[in-house]
Design a protein with these regions (language model features):
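Generic structural signal for hydrophobic
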Residues: 88, 116-119, 238-241, 271, ...
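Histidine-rich, glycine-flanked metal-binding segment
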Residues: 2-3, 10-57
Length: 380
């Protein structure tokens, strides 16, 4: 069967104009001007969907999501339930990378891998980081390098915590050893081999990453700090790291007055207005994770829960303020897909996976296609 999305305003993520997109199996086989001829085999069933001029974008790539649920920082009653697959589809997310956070004790790598399989069975593309906040790392094989090499779904280590009172207070040697395992494991397995680092509010900021780059031969792409928009000073440090070749990740968490954080939309808006490399920034959701507030003694006083819907909210914030969709979109699609070597993801082009999202005029998700199946349709 061939499926055709007719009359779509395609952002691939670059703007291509109004196109017809042809899909066979799980792959895009043609992107042509609307109404133009496209040769198809005789006798093949063709199913057409008229998009009616709406915007068609690649499925969003969320590289930081608690697919088995996060939380637990104030006892077991504060553990967050695992988000359903429908949650991701409704947010326009078709590719997700799961992880463990603070609680890498009662939650396990085994559970995380089962979560990846469950999402794949529901039609999502899913991977995971091995490890969690703490060192020594929680792994399946006993070695992060072996997890990366031997387990298909594992693309690197994360979210290993630094500059945070909940971290293992890592030394430089421990960071270097872990980053080396990521790098070499990635080389052997042809994977990203990335060390995905949780950044807290600690005054040391990104100092461990700077030291690691200064005192080792490891390439900058191995170090992937996230939550870098949680403080102004931290974001300034992160901008400097991109000049060395590091890829940085901002989080689309809610912002409260006086907490010092920068919204994902504001952070990306600032980044895009600079002369920094456009491919070295991504936006993730922390979906399913606990977003806690602690007192001065490190006790949690309240928390919120992250959601993948925050990605589309940030994207709409950007476009609503005048940022062109094709400028904003790479940070949500092609940038994370290419940095993490998620082949076939993040673009609308021949040979890529047919992970496609149709947007309504108001920026909400109208429908989602993955592997030629419709996984979500807005009921409104």
């Amino acid at each position: 069967m061939i499926q055709v999305l007719r009359n779509a305003q395609v952002y691939a993520p670059q703007s291509l104009g109004v196109k017809d997109v042809f899909i066979a199996g799980s792959k895009i086989i043609g992107v042509v001007d609307a109404g133009c001829e496209f040769e198809l085999p005789d006798g093949v069933e063709v199913v057409e969907h008229d998009v009616l001029g709406r915007r068609l974008i690649p499925g969003l790539v969320d590289c930081h999501a608690h697919i088995t649920g996060g939380g637990g920082e104030d006892g077991a009653s504060t553990k967050v339930a695992a988000p359903l697959a429908e949650t991701y589809f409704a947010a326009g997310v078709t590719s997700v990378v799961g992880l463990l956070g603070t609680d890498d004790i009662t939650r396990s790598t085994e559970e995380l891998l089962a979560g990846v399989r469950a999402l794949r069975e529901e039609g999502l593309s899913a991977w995971c980081w091995t490890g969690g906040y703490h060192y020594p790392l929680t792994t399946l094989t006993g070695s992060p390098r072996e997890d990366i090499v031997h387990i298909d779904a594992v693309i690197g280590v994360g979210e290993l915590a630094i500059s945070d009172h909940r971290s293992s207070q890592l030394t430089l040697d421990e960071v270097l050893r872990t980053a080396s395992d990521c790098h070499v494991g990635g080389l052997i397995a042809r994977k990203a081999g990335v060390l995905h680092l949780h950044l807290g509010d600690g005054k040391r900021g990104l100092d461990l990453i700077r030291q690691a780059l200064e005192q080792s031969e490891l390439p900058a792409r191995v170090f992937h700090p996230t939550h870098v928009n949680r403080q102004r000073a931290l974001f300034d440090e992160a901008l400097e790291l991109t000049k060395l070749g590091c890829h940085i990740d901002v989080t689309a968490f809610p912002i409260e007055d006086g907490d010092g954080a920068i919204s994902a939309a504001d952070a990306l808006r600032e980044y895009l207005a600079s002369d920094l490399p456009g491919n070295l920034i991504s936006v993730s959701s922390d979906g399913g994770g606990c977003l806690p507030v602690f007192d001065e003694q490190g006790r949690m006083v309240k928390y919120d829960v992250g959601t993948s819907a925050s990605l589309l909210e940030a994207l709409n914030d950007l476009t609503g303020s005048g940022v062109a969709l094709d400028c904003a979109l790479p940070a949500f699609t092609s940038n994370p897909a290419e940095h993490l070597r998620l082949d076939g993801k993040g673009r609308i082009a021949v040979g890529y996976d047919a992970d496609l999202v149709v947007l309504d005029d108001d920026g909400s998700v109208a429908s989602v296609f993955t592997a030629a199946e419709t996984h979500y349709k807005n009921k409104n």
